[in-house]
Amino acid sequence: MRVHVLYFADAREAVGRTEEWLEVPPGVATVGALRDHLCARGGPWAVLARRGTRFAINRAVAPGASAPIHDGDEIAVFPAISGG
């Protein structure tokens, strides 16, 4: 399966890229599994495991780590939004 991953804000700064097309191995079928796969790269990729990091699938916020991903999906990675 191949997905298009977009990185925003601190995720973009940490990993040093704005986007990539990623071939994911079998078994990576959810947002949580994709996050773990990316974090396994080590080093700056660990920022994606931070509490509050959010994911969107095809421009809709993923409801949780168990949200399924599919071939060709656009996955956005961004920090939690806060305000006041």
Where are these regions (language model features)?
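Ubiquitin-like/PB1-type beta-grasp interaction modules and other compact soluble beta-rich domains
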Residues: 1-83
